[in-house]
């Protein structure tokens, strides 16, 4: 029975298969002298397939503690799809053939993520395994919203009545909501036409979206800051936008993406990063490519 090594752990290849057979069929490991060398992910993958056994009964638990359940599930799914998979510095990279590897970060439900990670350390996919072991995959991409609405400078008095803001005078059609001859304004709209574009991060994002030619309405009923239409002819909002604090629990991010997916919209997380409004689109995907 041929054998191999994974760190300090010795394993044996089952069913009379050779080391070269394992390397050729599963595209994992390499030879060093007479031994097949595997990393912990590769070793566990072959163990669960019944291709190897361990010399020491404690080896399985030791290796599983090294990789964690969540990362192993991601690895196994990718391997079963025929990818070459490697873990490096906490990220999983995968590819077929010689193309550029795609990247994946595993997130637990209650992990925290910083907006700076989304823009400075981007990955192609996020992968989460819930408490019942079911995986969910999200694609991630920085985007630059580009609406079709021709924007001209807007400035008008704002009147407070009944605890709400109303626009006085002629306003552009895309600002406010008609109410018995008045124009009811959201707080962001009121700040915008008052010239107070930097009252808060939310106001800064609102102003930036308007400047990009987008039509911006409240996203409250979807649990977001805004729903965004790219043009007057849009039948439905293309985006939901939430202004993200410096750090957020992954559970909250995932919940927003799920809501957007259920109403066929793209979830965008926005924040002010290095004095610039940045946008990252996250989508729930049924399957990795």
Curated annotation (Swiss-Prot):
Gene Ontology annotations of biological process type: tRNA splicing, via endonucleolytic cleavage and ligation
Keyword entries, A-Z: Lyase, tRNA processing
Cellular component, GO annotation: cytoplasm
Catalytic activity: pretRNA = a 3'-half-tRNA molecule with a 5'-OH end + a 5'-half-tRNA molecule with a 2',3'-cyclic phosphate end + an intron with a 2',3'-cyclic phosphate and a 5'-hydroxyl terminus
Catalytic residue list: 229, 236, 265
InterPro entries recorded: tRNA_endonuc-like_dom_sf (IPR011856), tRNA_intron_Endo_cat-like_sf (IPR036167), tRNA_intron_Endonuc_cat-like (IPR006677), tRNA_intron_Endonuc_N_sf (IPR036740), tRNA_splic (IPR006676), tRNA_splic_arch_long (IPR023516)
UniProt GO molecular function: lyase activity; nucleic acid binding; tRNA-intron endonuclease activity
Pfam families reported for this sequence: EndA_linker, tRNA_int_endo
EC number: 4.6.1.16
Family, similarity comment: Belongs to the tRNA-intron endonuclease family. Archaeal long subfamily.
UniProt subunit comment: Homodimer.
Stated role: Endonuclease that removes tRNA introns. Cleaves pre-tRNA at the 5'- and 3'-splice sites to release the intron. The products are an intron and two tRNA half-molecules bearing 2',3' cyclic phosphate and 5'-OH termini. Recognizes a pseudosymmetric substrate in which 2 bulged loops of 3 bases are separated by a stem of 4 bp.
The protein's name: tRNA-splicing endonuclease
């Amino acid at each position: 029975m041929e054998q191999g090594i994974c760190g300090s752990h010795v394993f044996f290849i089952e069913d009379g298969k050779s080391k070269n057979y394992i390397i050729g069929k599963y595209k994992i490991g390499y030879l060093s002298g007479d031994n097949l060398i595997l990393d912990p992910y590769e070793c566990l993958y072959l163990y669960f397939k019944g291709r190897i056994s361990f010399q020491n009964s404690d080896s399985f638990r030791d290796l599983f503690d090294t990789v964690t359940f969540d990362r192993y599930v991601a690895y196994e799914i990718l391997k079963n799809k025929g990818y070459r998979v490697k873990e490096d510095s906490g990220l999983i990279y995968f590819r077929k053939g010689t193309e550029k590897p795609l990247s994946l970060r595993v997130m637990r439900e209650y992990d925290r993520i910083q907006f700076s990670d989304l823009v400075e350390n981007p990955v192609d996919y996020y992968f989460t395994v819930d408490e019942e072991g079911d995986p969910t995959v999200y694609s991630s991409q920085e985007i630059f919203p580009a609406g079709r609405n021709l924007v001209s400078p807007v400035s008008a008095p704002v009147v407070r009545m009944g605890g709400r803001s109303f626009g006085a005078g002629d306003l552009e059609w895309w600002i406010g909501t008609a109410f018995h001859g008045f124009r009811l304004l959201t707080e962001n709209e009121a700040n915008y036409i008052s010239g107070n574009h930097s009252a808060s991060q939310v106001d800064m994002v609102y102003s930036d979206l308007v400047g990009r030619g987008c039509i911006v309405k409240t996203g409250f009923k979807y649990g977001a800051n805004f729903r965004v239409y790219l043009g007057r002819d849009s039948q439905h909002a293309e985006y939901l936008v939430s202004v993200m604090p410096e750090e957020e629990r992954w559970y909250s991010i995932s919940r927003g993406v799920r809501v957007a997916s259920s109403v066929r919209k793209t979830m965008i997380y926005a924040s002010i990063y290095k004095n610039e409004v940045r946008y990252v689109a996250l989508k729930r995907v049924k399957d990795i490519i």
